[in-house]
């Protein structure tokens, strides 16, 4: 079974390397692997599957793939994979699917668990910005999250990290949240 799981992952990776033209095949391979292998192998294939769903959503503009990715990440979390990356991806997808209250709930928990990770505050700023816009509220909380994200991000930049979403957040802070 280990070899079969590796074979599915490798075949899916080859599809990913070829590019967007093979996304459907990559998704089908990973789903087939999940169906064929015992439940214990779900987590070994699911992260790759969720990533493929996200790329397919970007390539097609179809939010159904984001929902598939969200369900996949939520199952990963339910299966005990509670890493920062899995939980951040859940919050990011909830944000993209306009479920701002659920995204905020996840991000508040992440803030407690990872108080020094700029990505948590980046997404808190995005989500709070949407909530403030909907509620006609001042952007005080949003700017607070943004400032914390920017400060923590500067430390990451010193070690060579670049995050284009932080550029987007900078633009939003300058243009929308004053």
Language model features with spans:
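Canonical tetratricopeptide repeat
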Residues: 3, 10, 48, 89, ...
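Helix-start (N-cap) detector for alpha-helical repeat units in TPR-like alpha-solenoids
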Residues: 5, 41-43, 50, 83-85, ...
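Residue-level recognition of tetratricopeptide repeat
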Residues: 13, 51, 55-58, 92, ...
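Residue-level detector of the short coil/turn that links helix A to helix B
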Residues: 19-21, 57, 64, 98, ...
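TPR/TPR-like (Sel1-like) alpha-helical repeat modules
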Residues: 31, 129, 138-158
